[in-house]
Curated annotation (Swiss-Prot):
GO cellular component: DNA-directed RNA polymerase complex
Name listed for the protein in its UniProt record: DNA-directed RNA polymerase subunit beta'
BP terms from Gene Ontology: DNA-templated transcription
Cofactor: Mg(2+); Zn(2+)
Keywords assigned: DNA-directed RNA polymerase, Magnesium, Metal-binding, Nucleotidyltransferase, Transcription, Transferase, Zinc
Length: 1386
């Protein structure tokens, strides 16, 4: 099975250039005729070469007559030599006189003595031959491997056609009916004749009819599967019998070489061994047949032939793999193309590159941003050809050979020429692992002594490089086009913003930040305080003269006329600002965040060129003043707070108290654990705050007046951490505060914290406790790097063909976006969320209703600011999810190109950028788990809600009861409380947990900071809604409830336990005096409360209680530390649409929940809507139900704890909701780690997951029921049907995991190079699939330019005229860095 097209192009001169004009590539099953056509002769002997003459044996596997001469233009016997005899066939040895490279393309063949089934079509599940003949795999194998007979024609017997019978059964039937009563067959011949007999047209009609008439779903599925294969054969030109081979092709000998080693031995490709076995067995079979050997011997030989061909095509697929001399399985044809070492991934997608070198990197603090230091030795080697041609051109060398000698001798003139060649010649620097496109950037080389590459310090963040021994690779772009691309697109100066989130990636770090921070800090009572200056230059002069200190507080008249309070240091930083950048941005303490803001603003306000110059100047002054400051760390700098002892003593007392309560049985073990952990977390935070307070301020005294003032501290550790140069508060805390709680390997938090810090030193026990965290960190790093890399690979594969294909798709659909609110706090404002997007509808002012912005406006910083000022809370934006482009996405739906700041260009590969943006931090995060040393960090549990705004309280769906203290207790989980301002706009909204005490009423005026509600963060209470007598049902000692007496406390608590039998339902009912169960207020639901496993009873049977009393409480889960390690698998789980481990039950309709007993050991919940049928849900025993009896739930709401399954969300809430849910959940994981990724990247990937639909009813189209079809294809087909007056098909949306989506892509080349290569190729060849080469991968594989960026069809087919230029202008870089992109003329 080979690619016909490639063979038709073979050998022609046009064949070499033809690849550019390929329209599509087709794969199909090769017919015996076509295999013979490709072949140049039959291989009859298993011999390879003659061991004495080393010449190929005639008719053997390396035969020169079949495959071509071994030496260029020389026949085997040596009669004809040299070019003049080209094309002659030697009459003596039969070899054509031609170039020996034909041995790479000429094929041979083996004529098989008996047909053989192709293992791919037999064993790739589901078996193609089996499905077509409607036979099981086991039966098929029995027949093919000569174990049983198959009935070809039952004749007069009672057997059915295609029935498989054993040898014994066959003999019995012959005894009974006689020899000629039936026709049976065995082996591939029988199967071949059956396949030949098939009438596919009739079979199709029959299957379609049967599929429509049947009721059984399983049968329908089976029929559809068979129908698909039948249709595939009918639509392609393939014939079923070609799945059984009569001829085996032999690949060209140069592709399975035989290489002589020293000592007269040979190394050979495994394929030669496999071919040899096939030929040997084939020849033996021919001989046995000619001799008329007994049937059983021939059968055995045929079986062995089948097995040897199987091994040749796919060794190890069936039975044991054939091994070579050293016991290693031989590599078959399938293994050659499969996996990381296979043809696709090793040789076609990843090639080694010429003109490249690698070396260690060192920092180059003196370089400009567009430069890198290249060692002279490397440059000499990389630019050799250029030097040769220059030497020849100058007349310094007469031939290339003499030029070569000059270069080898390293003559002086060579170095001058090298300087000239290298000047302004862009080169590429790459650091592995290249996780995003900023891992390869272009620089101009400066020749340097030594052997290390010098790297500009500001690009280290993009490369994630440091100088502890990292290596980088250098590549030289050769063609003019490549050089222009490097210059205009890849130059480090053109990659200032990160493609992931649009923030600057070229930002000073470490020393530079420290230097700038030091410059801009102000101090009291410094030399020159209070002086006033008439202009910035005067300040610099005064500082240089030594009459003022760097940190003195002074007044300066600025060029715009304002008199500003500032310091000399800030004025000096202000001097390097480009025009258009406000001095106010540096008239503050420059921390890393502020510097990033400065660079971002400079980029927007002053342009690329100015920003580049600014960054370089900041780097220079930053280094200079970091050196002048001379900041170092000493042990004394780690000041331990005075109050540490007190805080520890108080906490210990509190913990002792909790222990006492636990012993007295007031609280349970889980509660004790939670409370203790909370106490220590709080203690750690308190000590940490105290330490920071003490370390972050110095008290300055004025010697003259004795006045004292607080100043920001000059403590080196504090300066490093506060400026963002190195370290964080967490690490400072561990140095000088306390290390805090640690986690066990299982993720649980150990109750005893490490109270010492590193300055005090750890005891042996404390040191031992902290080893857990350290080891976990290292283990995680090793394991997760691989996971993250694999996630990136899958992401890239699913979106590799998403390209910006048009300017506007004209959709009227989009997404509604509002503020991002978590737990009532606005985590991200609307303006931030919609930045860089395009509005879908005109935006109107909520108060005046005037139109602020028309539809299709790109929201840039200015528009976003206006949105914020107008108080707009939500608006509709366009999104990749709703884009209607058939291929790729349109520019308007995508919005801004984050790395460039304007609307995205047509031809941009937004898919790959999205995949890289999501995959890159994955690796970063996994590598950074251990930075906190496994110290358990955990937020103190929230236990109340305070108003963030002043306004009026509004209650939504709140059910509450008044308890005896007159407080409102919230019932159920569906309640929310919100605040509305005077205009009636909702400002905030919070979910109220069950059992919360509510402090406000509907419509009450609320001040900012007022307490709205509070609750117990460790327990979930079950509150009684009515007064009455307690009556226990199914609460039976030892069966459903256990009196847990603590060994430590001797106190007993009654806890509901896991119960084995199914018919128990522990509950507490409230009755009147006669024992009749009361009903809940405002409903007729009985006041009976079912209790989950783990609930602790707070009342006794028969006790009298009032409304609002707590019947029982369930401790909330003890907290485990969250790591991104929990995060990466979560991201993968979402992208792969896997069933979550803790799957939640989701309601599919709106309605009221009622608890309806148990069935099969599961609790039954019924949701009753206002109209229509009710729905039942079964909940497993241990699962905690999050709704209470009588709650109102919306469709899509979770009834139990856990994560909902994505298919459920899609079914209930639809595509948009699902897409939104996915984006939010994935963003949660990344935000938790402080990683910023723009939503649009995740949307692009989710778009690919949702690009298919499942056909429900094919109508009068060519689709089949249950078929998965591309949305675009489905739309087009339906449109056609409607135009022609046929019934269109109906379908439902489908969500696929990224691996599945990659494998079902329309390009078989791309899918095959991803995973499951043999399966993909088998399916594709069966369908005779065309690959239209639209994605990036398939084009790289066939060796063309990718259809994106400068290779996009609109750019490639246009003529660009460039005026002649003799000399390259000196300031080529300056021109280009600030220059716009080249204009393309059509």
């Amino acid at each position: 099975m080979t690619l016909d097209d490639l063979f038709s192009m073979r050998g022609t001169a046009a064949g070499q250039t033809n690849i550019r004009n390929l329209k599509a590539m087709q794969i199909s099953i090769a017919s015996p005729e076509s295999i013979r056509e490709w072949s140049y002769g039959e291989v009859k002997k298993p011999e390879t070469i003659n061991y004495r003459t080393f010449k190929p044996e005639r008719d053997g596997l390396f035969c020169a007559k079949i495959f071509g001469p071994v030496k260029d233009y020389e026949c085997n016997c040596g009669k004809y030599k040299r070019m003049k005899h080209r094309g002659i066939v030697c009459e003596k040895c039969g070899v054509e006189v031609i170039a020996s490279k034909v041995r790479r393309e000429r094929m041979g063949h083996i004529e098989l003595a008996a047909p053989v089934a192709h293992i791919w079509f037999l064993k790739t599940l589901p078996s193609k031959i089996g499905t077509l003949l409607d036979m099981t795999m086991a039966d098929l194998e029995k027949v093919l491997y000569f174990d049983s007979y198959i009935v070809l024609d039952p004749g007069s017997t009672s057997l059915a056609k295609l029935q498989v019978i054993s040898e014994d059964q066959y003999l019995q039937i012959i005894d009974h009916y006689g020899e000629d009563a039936l026709v049976v067959g065995m082996g591939a011949e029988a199967i071949r004749s059956l396949l030949e007999e098939l009438n596919l047209e009739a079979l199709r009609a029959e299957l379609r009819e049967e599929s429509q008439s049947t009721r059984s779903q399983t049968k329908k599925k089976k029929l559809t599967k068979r129908l698909k294969i039948v249709e595939a054969f009918l639509e392609s030109d393939n014939k079923p019998e070609w799945m059984v081979m009569e001829v085996v092709p032999v690949i060209p000998p140069e592709l399975r070489p035989l290489v002589p080693l020293d000592g007269g031995r040979f190394a050979t490709s495994d394929l030669n061994d496999l071919y040899r076995r096939v030929i040997n067995r084939n020849n033996r079979l021919k001989r046995l047949m000619e001799l008329g050997a007994p049937d059983i011997i021939i059968r055995n030989e045929k079986r062995m032939l089948q097995e040897s061909v199987d091994a040749l095509f796919d060794n190890g697929r069936r039975g044991r793999a054939i091994t070579g001399t050293n016991g290693r399985p031989l590599k078959s044809l399938s293994d050659m193309i499969k996996g990381k070492q296979g043809r696709f991934r090793q040789n076609l997608l990843g090639k080694r590159v010429d003109y490249s070198g690698r070396s260690v990197i060192v920092v180059g603090p003196k370089l400009k941003l567009h430069q890198c230091g290249l060692p002279k030795k490397m440059a000499l080697e990389l630019f050799k050809p250029f030097i040769y041609s220059k030497l020849e051109e100058r007349g310094l060398a007469s031939t290339i050979k003499s030029a070569k000698k000059m270069v080898e001798r390293e003559e002086l003139v060579v170095w001058d020429i090298l300087e000239e060649v290298v000047r302004e010649y862009p080169i590429l620097l790459n650091r592995a692992p290249t996780l995003h496109r900023l891992g390869i950037q272009a620089f101009e080389p400066l020749l340097v002594e030594g052997k290390a590459i010098q790297l500009h310090p500001l690009v280290c963040a993009a490369y994630n490089a440091d100088f502890d021994g990292d290596q980088m690779a250098v590549h030289v772009p050769l063609s003019v086009e490549a050089q222009i691309e490097c210059r205009v697109l890849m130059m480090s100066t053109n990659n200032i913003l990160s493609p992931a989130n649009g923030t600057p990636v070229i930002v000073p770090s470490q020393d530079i930040v420290l230097g700038l921070y030091y410059m801009t800090v102000e101090r009291s009572f410094e030399k020159g305080e209070g002086m006033a200056f008439c202009a910035p230059w005067e300040v610099v002069a005064a500082y240089d003269a030594g009459s003022i200190s760097l940190h003195a507080r002074i007044k300066v008249r600025m060029p715009d006329g304002r008199l500003l309070n500032t310091t000399p240091g800030r004025i000096m930083v202000g001097e390097v600002l480009p025009e258009g950048v406000h001095f106010d941005l540096v008239n503050t303490v420059l921390t890393k965040k502020n510097i990033a803001r400065l660079v971002g603003n400079a980029y927007r306000d002053a342009g690329t060129k100015a920003t580049v110059l600014l960054c370089d100047r900041l780097k220079d002054i930053g280094y200079e003043f970091a050196t002048r400051a001379g900041v170092t760390i000493g042990v004394k700098d780690m000041t331990i707070p005075q109050s540490k002892k007190g805080i520890l003593a108080d906490s210990q007392a509190e913990v002792d108290n909790i222990e006492r309560q636990y012993r007295d049985g007031i609280i349970t073990r889980t509660e004790k654990y939670n409370k203790v952990v909370d106490v220590w977390t709080k203690a750690t935070q308190d000590i940490s705050q105290e330490m920071i307070k003490e370390i972050s301020y110095d008290v300055m005294r004025d010697e003259k007046t004795g006045k004292e003032e607080l100043n920001q501290s000059f403590n080196p550790i504090f300066m490093m951490s506060n400026s963002g140069a190195r370290g964080n508060q967490d690490q400072m805390r561990q140095l000088a505060g306390m290390r805090g709680l640690m986690a066990k390997p299982s993720g649980e938090i150990i109750e005893t914290p490490i109270t010492s810090c590193f300055r005090e030193g750890l005891s042996v026990l404390q040191y031992f406790t902290s080893t857990h965290g350290a080891r976990k960190g290292l283990a995680d790093t090793a394991l997760k790097t691989a996971n993250s890399g694999y996630l990136t690979r899958r992401l890239v594969d699913v979106v590799q063909d998403v390209i910006i294909s048009e300017h506007d798709c004209g959709t009227v659909d989009g997404l509604e976006v509002g503020h991002l609110i978590k737990g009532g706090d606005i985590k991200m404002r609307l303006a931030e969320r919609v930045l860089g997007r395009v509005t879908l509808y005109p935006v109107t002012d909520p108060e005046t209703t005037e139109v602020l912005f028309p539809a299709n406006t790109l929201i840039d910083e200015n528009v976003a600011k206006k949105l914020d000022e107008a108080g707009i809370n939500s608006l509709h934006i366009r999104s990749a999810l709703t884009c209607r482009s058939d291929r790729g996405v349109c520019a308007m739906c995508y919005g801004r190109d984050l790395a460039r700041g304007h609307v995205v260009n047509i031809g941009e590969t937004v898919g790959i950028i999205a995949a890289q943006s999501i995959g890159e931090p994955g690796t970063q995060l996994t590598m950074r788990t251990f930075h906190i040393g496994g110290t358990a960090s955990r937020e103190i549990e929230r236990s109340n809600i305070q108003a963030q705004y002043t306004g009026r309280a509004v209650l939504y769906r709140v059910k509450s009861v008044r308890n005896k203290d007159g407080q409102h207790m919230v019932m159920g989980k569906s309640g929310q409380v919100g605040i509305v301002d005077e205009q009636g706009r909702e400002r905030e909204k919070y979910v109220l947990p069950s059992g919360a005490k509510l402090h406000v009423e509907e419509g009450q005026e609320v001040k900012k900071g007022q307490l709205l509600a509070e609750w117990d963060p460790f327990n979930e209470p079950f509150v009684s809604e009515v007064d009455g007598l307690v009556k226990f049902t199914d609460i039976i000692e030892g069966k459903t409830v256990q009196e847990k007496a603590d060994e430590a406390t001797q106190m007993t608590t009654q806890t509901i336990i896991e119960y084995r039998t199914t018919n128990f339902r522990p509950a507490v009912a409230l009755c009147d005096a006669d024992g009749v169960v009361k009903t809940r207020p405002e409903s007729n639901i009985p006041a009976s409360y079912s209790l989950p496993v783990g609930a602790i009873l707070m009342v006794r049977d028969g006790q009298e209680i009032t409304a609002g009393d707590i019947i029982a409480r369930k401790p909330r889960e003890s907290s485990k530390t969250k790591d991104i390690v929990g995060g990466l698998p979560r991201v993968a789980e979402l992208f792969e649409v896997r069933k979550p481990k803790d799957m939640a039950v989701v309601s599919q309709i709106d309605g009221i929940v009622t608890f309806a007993g148990e069935t099969k050991g599961k609790r039954k919940l019924v949701v009753t809507p206002e109209t229509g049928d009710e729905k039942e849900y079964l909940v497993p025993k241990g699962k905690h139900i999050t709704v209470t009896d009588g709650d109102f739930v919306e469709a899509g709401e979770m009834l139990t704890e856990g994560h909902p399954e994505l298919h459920d969300i899609l079914g209930v809430k639809g595509e948009k909701y699902l897409a939104n849910y996915l984006v939010e959940e994935i963003q949660d994981v990344y935000r938790f780690q402080g990683v910023g990724i723009d939503d649009k990247h995740i949307e692009v990937i989710v778009r690919q997951m949702l690009k298919k639909v499942t056909v429900l009813d094919p109508g009068q189209t060519s689709f089949l029921v249950g078929e998965q079809v591309d949305k675009a294809e489905f739309r087009i087909e339906n449109q056609k049907a409607i135009e022609e007056g046929r019934t269109p098909a109906t379908a439902e949306p489908l969500v696929l995991g990224i691996t599945q989506a990659s494998l079902t892509t329309s390009s078989f080349i791309s899918a095959a190079s991803f995973q499951e290569t043999t399966k993909v190729l088998t399916e594709a060849s069966l369908r005779g699939k065309n690959d239209h080469l639209r994605g990036l991968k398939e084009n790289v594989i066939v060796g063309r330019l990718i259809p994106a960026g400068t290779g996009y069809r609109e750019y490639v087919h246009s003529d660009i005229s460039v005026p002649e230029q003799k000399e390259r202008p000196d300031r080529f870089l300056e021109e280009l860095v600030g220059a716009p992109q080249p204009v393309v003329e059509d």
